[in-house]
Design a protein with these regions (language model features):
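Glycine-rich, aromatic-flanked loop segments that form ligand/cofactor-binding clefts
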Residues: 80-82, 106, 112-157, 193-194
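Active-site-adjacent "subsite" loops/lids of carbohydrate-active enzymes
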Residues: 48-63, 119, 135-186
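Catalytic domains of carbohydrate-active enzymes, especially glycoside hydrolases
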Residues: 67-92, 183-193, 264-268, 340-348
Length: 363
């Protein structure tokens, strides 16, 4: 026993690990220094969700113009601003790392500096939402047709506007989209809002080929993407929301959007209840566009029913534009806002493709 003790003592002196000691259980020698602690990333400051969201949408191109973003952030009464992070052209509004796929396919553009924009919005007390277009992506599909919805001959399938769409069944597409969303979250955006989170709604859909397609219903594929996206983004401290079609609350539009199912995973749902987009006779209205307040009220009634028991709040997109004239009269925009408020929405977001808004209605 005395000899064994001498051997053990010698081994310990030489720095060997003795079985049964704490050092052995930790996988290091008794005399080695403890491994350095992993430095935690400092939490990114966030602006809380406003009591009433009163917001507008801004394109990345507009944000690149001198003084334009400052103007939007200074609109009296504005509490939220949605800025394109990844748009329907497939462009990402800021520079991603040089090794990223977005840079390799030419999608990453220096329209704005994400951290600087987030800091500016935070200083103004404005809640910053990053819009991320998901599956419509002509830029990615042009460079990577293997990630696209395809034709029978293997070419990139295109919708009626001639735009390619990424394949919703391909997880590589999911991760590509989320790379931009995560970058915006880390830069300080308060919320990521997914748009075009669906299958195509127009074009020669009957000829579309989806590599890797399963027997799973499209609505479950979209739900799986949304669930996956939230598990990736929530640890970064951002809220997550979705844009959905205005009629998706009561109808299967064939694009995979089921609001009641999707609302299980996100913080907010933003239905696009644009009165000009409803056909005559919808909600028993001869001309829904001519009755904007009633159209929004009927639409949000259906969404409130679809979201019963869900945690997601309702923040609709309203129409501050017109398909038949340059501008929609202010009283018609106000009628939509009033309808949203009566429907117990958590606020509203105004959409105008040209970025010109009826600013006095945000007060």
């Amino acid at each position: 026993m005395y000899a064994v003790a001498i051997v053990l003592a010698a081994l310990v002196a030489l720095g060997a690990t003795v079985i049964g000691t704490r050092a052995a259980r930790n996988g290091r020698s008794a005399t080695s220094k403890p491994p350095p602690k992993t430095k935690k990333r400092e939490a990114v400051p966030r602006t809380p969700l406003p009591q009433e969201v009163r917001g507008v949408h801004v394109t990345m191109a507009l944000a690149s113009l001198p003084g334009k973003l400052d103007h939007y952030l200074s609109i009296p009464g504005l509490t939220a601003l949605e800025l394109d992070v990844k748009d329907e052209n497939g462009e990402v509004g800021f520079l991603m790392p040089a090794t990223s796929l977005a840079r390799k396919v030419g999608a990453s553009k220096p329209y704005y500096r994400a951290r600087a924009v987030a800091a500016k919005a935070r200083a103004k007390g404005v809640y910053l939402i990053g819009r991320v277009v998901v599956f419509e992506d002509p830029m990615l599909t042009a460079s990577r047709p293997d990630l696209a919805i395809q034709t029978g001959g293997g070419a990139v399938w295109r919708n009626n506007a001639g735009l390619g769409w990424a394949n919703p069944y391909d997880k590589r597409v999911w991760d590509y989209v989320l790379s931009a969303a995560k970058a915006a979250a880390r830069a300080g955006f308060d919320e990521i809002q997914f748009d075009y989170v669906r299958f195509p709604s127009d074009g020669p859909i009957e000829s579309a080929v989806f590599p890797g397609k399963t027997a799973e219903a499209p609505a479950w594929t979209i739900a799986r993407f949304v669930h996956y996206a939230t598990t990736q983004l929530k640890p970064l401290g951002v809220r997550v929301s979705l844009d959905v079609f205005g009629l998706s609350a009561t109808r299967d539009l064939g694009v995979g959007q089921k609001p009641g199912r999707l609302a299980k995973y996100v913080d907010a749902l933003s239905p696009m209840v644009y009165p000009s987009h409803y056909n005559p006779g919808e909600f028993d209205l001869t001309d829904p566009s001519a009755s904007p307040g009633r159209t929004v009220a009927f639409s949000l009634r259906d969404f409130n029913n679809a979201l019963l028991g869900r945690k997601a709040v309702l923040i609709p997109w309203l129409e501050d534009f017109s398909l038949t004239s340059d501008r929609r009269p202010p009283e018609e925009v106000q009628a939509q806002i009033d309808a949203a408020r009566r429907s117990n929405a958590r606020g509203f977001l105004l959409w105008n493709p040209s970025g010109v808004y009826t600013e006095e209605l945000l007060k």
